């Protein structure tokens, strides 16, 4: 199973990049949700503009699909500068990063997605560039090799990551601004869906937008993807106008339930309930029961279910909670299992 094959995957598909770019907000005034992040960035950007300085380096972290790339582009637009975009895996050698740094103009934004995947050699080049706006380059080889320093124009590095814990301390400490993006509430997602529908010339009422929002797992990227699929359903099975009923029919057909679960989420939870009496069960046994790899369970399926309170990890294995039994209308066994969660 590939995560990007799931309709409710938070990872971007290749074709989605072009569509998302067309509906992406370009200014903080258009940015929906994340009120704390938005307020802080308004202050930091206004202060930097007032001093006519480059904005301090910014680290943005949080789950995929919440708008890290969008925020990086907004920062560049608000500062009135250009943005150069790359990613950690692309910067294989120190020379790759050096080439990008030497092409920056004063105040420009360098956006590095998946910054936690930078190699140690590339990070070493980045440290003096971030701290002193200098680039150390080795010329020659062997005993004749020597280091020269090149001055760089002041610039802003914006790094994005879904796994902030994998950043090295020296790199993390060089970011003056650190922002965490949280999952969106239903109201903000409804606003995002309504805006996306307007920009895409899709007719939708507020109830229809809310029905999509509550099944979008708190993630704008998923919300916009579901909007496109519901639009298809509305155009073929109705008059093209998305109502709550049309959205409900479409999403039920797509097997996305009221909590945003798809067939894989349900299969995992039901296996724990029906085959293991709710747990505790080891991840290897669970993987065998649903014919999935251990990594798929740990990295793709579990995080959302744990965060939403449908399952927990304990020293004895995985267990479902009472929420899972209620969701499927199953009476939990009277064994006091939840009292033993932390034994």
UniProtKB/Swiss-Prot annotation:
One of its GO terms (molecular function) is ATP binding. Keywords: ATP-binding, Cytoplasm, DNA damage, DNA recombination, DNA repair, DNA-binding, Hydrolase, Nucleotide-binding. ATP binds at residues 23-24, 65, 68-70, 131-133, 174, 184, 221. Pfam families: AAA_lid_4 (PF17864), RuvB_C (PF05491), RuvB_N (PF05496). Residues 4-184 are annotated as: Large ATPase domain (RuvB-L). GO terms for cellular component: cytoplasm; Holliday junction resolvase complex. This is Holliday junction branch migration complex subunit RuvB. It comes from Marinobacter nauticus (strain ATCC 700491 / DSM 11845 / VT8) (Marinobacter aquaeolei).
């Amino acid at each position: 199973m590939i995560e990007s094959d799931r309709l409710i995957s938070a990872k971007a598909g290749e074709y989605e990049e072009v569509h998302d770019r067309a509906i992406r907000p370009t200014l903080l005034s258009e940015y929906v949700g994340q009120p704390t992040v938005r307020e802080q960035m308004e202050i930091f950007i206004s202060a930097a503009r007032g001093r006519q300085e480059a904005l301090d380096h910014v680290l943005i972290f949080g789950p995929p699909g919440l708008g890290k790339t969008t925020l990086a582009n907004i920062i560049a637009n608000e500062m009135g500068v250009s943005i150069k975009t790359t990613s950690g895996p692309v910067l294989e050698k120190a020379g790759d990063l050096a080439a990008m740094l030497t092409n920056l103009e004063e105040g420009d934004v360098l956006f590095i997605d998946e910054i936690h995947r930078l190699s140690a050699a590339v990070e070493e080049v980045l440290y003096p560039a971030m701290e002193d706006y200098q680039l150390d380059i080795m010329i020659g080889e062997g005993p004749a090799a020597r280091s020269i320093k090149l001055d760089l124009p002041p610039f802003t590095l914006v790094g994005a990551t879904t796994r902030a814990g994998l950043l090295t301390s020296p790199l993390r400490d060089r970011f003056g601004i650190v922002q965490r993006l949280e999952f969106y509430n239903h109201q903000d997602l409804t606003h995002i869906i309504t805006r996306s529908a307007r920009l895409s010339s899709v007719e939708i009422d507020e109830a229809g937008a809310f029905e999509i929002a509550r099944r979008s797992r708190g993630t704008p990227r998923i919300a916009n993807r579901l909007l496109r699929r519901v639009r298809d359903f509305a155009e073929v099975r109705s008059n093209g106008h998305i109502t709550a009923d049309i959205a409900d029919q479409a999403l039920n057909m797509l097997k996305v339930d009221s909590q945003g679960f798809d067939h894989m989420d349900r299969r995992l939870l039901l296996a724990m309930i029906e085959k293991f009496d709710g747990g505790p069960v080891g991840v290897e046994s669970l993987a065998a029961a649903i014919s999935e790899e251990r990594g798929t369970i740990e990295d793709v399926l579990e995080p959302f279910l744990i965060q939403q309170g449908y399952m927990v990890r304990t020293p004895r294995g995985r267990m479902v909670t009472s929420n899972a039994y209620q969701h499927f209308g199953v009476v939990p066994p009277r064994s006091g299992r939840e009292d033993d969660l932390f034994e």
